[in-house]
Curated annotation (Swiss-Prot):
InterPro entries in the record: Cyclotide, Cyclotide_bracelet_CS, Cyclotide_sf
Species of provenance: Pigea enneasperma (Spade flower)
GO terms (BP aspect): cytolysis in another organism; defense response
Post-translational modifications reported in the UniProt record: This is a cyclic peptide.
Taxonomic path: Eukaryota, Viridiplantae, Streptophyta, Embryophyta, Tracheophyta
Transport listed as a keyword: no
Tissue and organ expression note: Detected in stems (at protein level).
Entry similarity comment: Belongs to the cyclotide family. Bracelet subfamily.
Keyword Disulfide bond part of the UniProt annotation: yes
Protein function: Probably participates in a plant defense mechanism.
Record remark: domains: The presence of a 'disulfide through disulfide knot' structurally defines this protein as a knottin.
Keywords of the record: Disulfide bond, Knottin, Plant defense
Disulfide bonds: 4-20, 8-22, 13-27
Name the record gives this protein: Cyclotide hyen-H
């Protein structure tokens, strides 16, 4: 997993368009 440098505590991952998903309050790319 690669951290996308974004948190998803209050809002979803904006970086999800790049393939990132929320895991443990942080956005990761598999």
């Amino acid at each position: 997993k690669i951290p996308c440098g974004e948190s998803c505590v209050y809002i979803p991952c904006i970086s999800s368009v790049l393939g990132c998903s929320c895991s443990n309050k942080v956005c990761y790319k598999d």
